[in-house]
Amino acid sequence: MAAAQQLYDVTRKWFALIPPVLCPVNFIIDAPFGRFAPKDNSIFMLDGIKSWIVMELVSPISFCYAFLQSPLSLTHNGSPPPLSFSHPPTLLAALFLVHYLNRAIISPLRTPSRSKSHISVPLAAVAFNITNGSLMGAYLSSTAAEKFLQGAFERPLFWVGVGLWALGFVGNILHDEILLNIRRSAKAKGKAKADEDDDNNGKSKSKQEHYAIPHGYLYELISYPNYFSEWVEWAGYAFVAAPLPSFTSLSSFLTTVTPPYLFLFAEFFTMIPRAYKGHKWYHARFPDYPKQRKAVIPFLF
């Protein structure tokens, strides 16, 4: 227990420090995947869909292992927590797994195409997801989480937070679906064009990822509503899963911050640069891109 607690605390503090340090770097360097993927076909470029599935599955797997092992629990003695939805930590564990069921399996399998990814991206994502999944699973099965969530179902604010999680989760899926429909439409048109080229010339051009201006829902206000929706999702989750950390000093923050808030902050610091640069990319690529749209926070940024 003592060794597990020490490892948990050290990992938690480093996980709090690294994302804000890397945030300015990501404003300068483009992460080599998606619209910023290199155009070459070197051995370091991986299939976009397969690499995505592998790197994202790491998170729920490491989460389940840590949650079932309960390394920070004084009551479970190494046995799993109660695996019932009447147990608040288990309900929150289920919400975490539902998110990754969609993110790691359903969404990529429904994606008609995805740009290749440089091997550095899935390697970094695997490191992130092992850390995040393990910390989250260890926390939700801990004695501290048990105490904080005792009687949670009787508190209206708990269900407000769960509602925020659900709103963000659905928003994420809705806006991702708009992007998927753009790809599906492009793939259908591309296949028809390729068939025509085959008939006329006996060969077709190499396949390239298609991009267009997305419309609908929050796309009328921001370029990255899927990012914004994910922040709403994990803000609601953190609100119900853990106490708010102290912001009086860096030392007090590192002492009191818990994995649900670490995940939220890490997503924010990681996605802000990507959204800003992607927003600029849209404007550069499409002269008619809506000028009133912000990057990722409606009306603000």
Which residues fall in each region the model found?
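Hydrophobic alpha-helical transmembrane segments of polytopic
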Residues: 15, 19, 52-59, 92-99, ...
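Short, amphipathic, aromatic/basic-enriched membrane-interface segments that mark the entry/exit
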Residues: 48, 93-95, 218-224
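Juxtamembrane helix-capping/reentrant segments at transmembrane boundaries
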Residues: 35-57, 118-127, 218, 293-300
